[in-house]
């Protein structure tokens, strides 16, 4: 059996008279239906009355949900010309080097299919699709306020523009806009341009300069340039072997524009071969793409063989360790080596080699770091392919330093040993450092359903226990120095509203002090408030409150001192550093420096 005690795990599946799946049980050890202490140990679904076999209701396990009617309900509707079921009609078309967005008002009633999904806590989402099945609009309701995300297509059915909620709120007129000139689209929209073969050649993300893409005749990405690359006058380039595997990625200084590159590669198939010595500028590969000598390879990858080892003494050769398997000479289809350069100093490179056994498993990885340190990793597997021992060896290149510091040692070995139960679950982890005694890092315990219920750390000095509800949601963490309980909808403290969709209603934390934190959410499942209480239900501080814009960015945080900290982390070009003063439980006040990096156009 698959359970820790060797019992069989039974799964039950239910079907209706039309042979449609309608239910599935949780795993039951030896078929014991009372294992979970809940009569509703299964999930299920209910179909609509139409012949389309559409599911109108799904429910998960748990009496707390089923007895309270807490399921996910789906209604299948058609659009209307007003209200929550209305949908704006957008389309996109090319306009030279620009994409034009055109709004033609609203779709006429009955033109679109609408699915209205209501989760267990009454949160509503509408999805609008056309007769071709293309998703046009996702409308999430925060109470009565819609948050609309539109996907706009061209006449060929290609996705051209995505309008998130703030953009959708601004573009309400029956009009057209150029994506390169509209401030709203530049700030919030996602825009895509294609070539005649339906390949994306330009992508614009909110607030960013466009990313350009160039392909060869085989539709492989050859060049890419984002806004920062353009400012630096470089392109990212890619080279591939005959099987389409990326062999080189690097940067290429060039002022050539995308259109000129497209002409160069339009009829070219860029396929590189490894030919070894004589191609030092390309690390043993040919250069059919004819990139100039000013290019800087950043990652070079080798496959199928180890002929590349002759290119550099920095590649560490195979170390024969019979306990860790035997290598094969030609691991076909496998990544065998890499040269990885530092981005800020490409002259410094790490050389990595991977060795495989006859079952295609990595048994040895050797790396010479940018500083010249030698690192070896050896892996031993059991019959079914699980690692049972991992040995890591580190060798320094500074023996002279040991003369100055005789007590120091710069060569180390760490061995990790793993034990598993009969079902492949890890049960023990051991570590041996250098020649020290082997210690047990962790021991894991599972319940009969296979869930982790306990973890003992460092030879039994630290014991952690975990508990779950019937849906597998974590409900308690019990450790020697703290206890945390997570409440959803069962055994709630007085005054806490139950939540059924997976949001946490209350957290109890006990360490030096004990406290409850009652959590509130908006209609989009965003945390809006956290109120702290003592275990006796007495408020200890004002609630922390959070507000958001329609993009999901935090716009303000109200902290226990009742001071508002304005949050600018996602606003372009406004502010980099925010010092937010606040008091913690009204005991003392401190300033928290919060760093936000501006997005670069």
Predicted regions and their residues:
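Beta-strand elements of repeat-based all-beta scaffolds
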Residues: 1-601
